[in-house]
UniProtKB/Swiss-Prot annotation:
Name of the gene encoding the protein in the UniProt record: ispE
Purpose: Catalyzes the phosphorylation of the position 2 hydroxy group of 4-diphosphocytidyl-2C-methyl-D-erythritol.
PANTHER family: 4-DIPHOSPHOCYTIDYL-2-C-METHYL-D-ERYTHRITOL KINASE, CHLOROPLASTIC
Residues involved in ATP binding: P94, V95, A96, A97, G98, L99, A100, G101, G102, S103, S104
GO process annotations (BP): isopentenyl diphosphate biosynthetic process, methylerythritol 4-phosphate pathway; terpenoid biosynthetic process
Stated name of the protein: 4-diphosphocytidyl-2-C-methyl-D-erythritol kinase
Organism annotation: Bacillus cereus (strain AH187)
Catalytic activity: 4-CDP-2-C-methyl-D-erythritol + ATP = 4-CDP-2-C-methyl-D-erythritol 2-phosphate + ADP + H(+)
Length: 289
């Protein structure tokens, strides 16, 4: 038996870091929403007791460094599953881009194997298991639009923002999340107003959302990688309604309401950035079939 599962990317509309925790993680407060850029996973049951990861993308690890592998291993161990699984990952989300591609693959694996192996877990139980794999996995299990607190695993759902275009541009560099957090000086950065963002989203106020986007990690990543700041400036110059870096970078996204402007910005960015995408904001929650 085999199953196809979608794994959508996320962007942060607001991301704040409140401090460092005793467990070494950082306390965060952020708003994430899913977008219509997704990896596709094919899960195929194996008679042998093993986990196999397949992908044409050479940047996707095929061992336990892969979060989808970790998700399958976790379910096998927790629920004493003796069957195996082959997971084929068709990557569309750029790797190491600040878009939670790996976390979303893990979340899709949890949802898919729950069905394939007839585990009968609720979406809340899957999200709880996701937190054992990575900070963004819980959110990715649910999808939709939510405030994430703690280290990112405590999820509170809010309304879906008004529909718009999301233009993504990823420079050809990698950003180490650990280095970004390591260089973060909380008293020297601009903290976004996360609570105000919740209010404007719940009010369906598109202009308010555009005026309130913010990411406390931007200044740090910009100092380490000035080309990310240049992409943000260029996207603003082309006329996006709001521009922000997602996660710890290096991907920058712009929100755009009008189709004609979206095409202009997309074509303009293609001139000097290798990976550019124009997708819709999804913001809808996942359901278990």
């Amino acid at each position: 038996m085999k199953l196809l599962v979608k794994a959508p990317a996320k962007i942060n509309l607001s991301l704040d870091v409140l401090g460092k925790r005793q467990d070494g993680y950082h306390e965060v407060k952020m708003i994430m929403t899913t977008i219509d850029l997704a990896d596709r996973l094919e899960l195929m049951e194996l008679a042998e007791d093993r986990i196999e990861i397949l992908s044409h993308n050479r940047y996707v690890p095929d061992d336990q460094r892969n979060l989808a592998y970790q998700a399958a291993k976790l379910l096998k161990e927790k629920f004493n599953v003796k069957k195996g699984v082959s997971i084929t990952i068709e990557k569309t989300i750029p790797v190491a881009a600040g878009l939670a591609g790996g976390s979303s693959d893990a979340a899709a694996t949890l949802r898919g194997l729950n069905k394939l192996w007839n585990l009968g877990l609720t979406i809340d139980q899957l999200a709880e298991l996701g937190a054992e794999i990575g900070s963004d996995v819980s959110f990715c299990v649910y999808g939709g639009t939510a405030i994430a607190t703690g280290r990112g695993e405590q999820i509170e759902h809010i309304k879906t923002p008004p529909s718009c275009w999301v233009i993504l541009a990823k420079p050809h560099i990698g950003v180490s999340t650990a280095d970004v957090y390591g260089n973060l000086k909380l008293n020297r950065v601009t903290h976004p107003n996360v609570d105000k963002m919740v209010d404007v989203i719940n009010a369906g106020d598109y202009k308010g959302i555009c005026d309130t986007v913010g990411n406390v990690l931007e200044d740090v990543t910009f100092a380490m990688h000035p080309e990310v700041a240049r992409i943000k400036a260029q996207m603003k110059r082309f006329g996006a309604d709001a521009v922000l870096m997602s996660g710890s970078g290096p991907t920058v996204f712009g929100l755009v309401h009008h189709d004609s402007r979206m095409h202009r910005i997309y074509n303009g960015l293609k001139g000097f950035c290798e990976q550019v995408y124009a997708v819709r904001l999804l913001g809808e929650r996942e359901t278990l079939e």
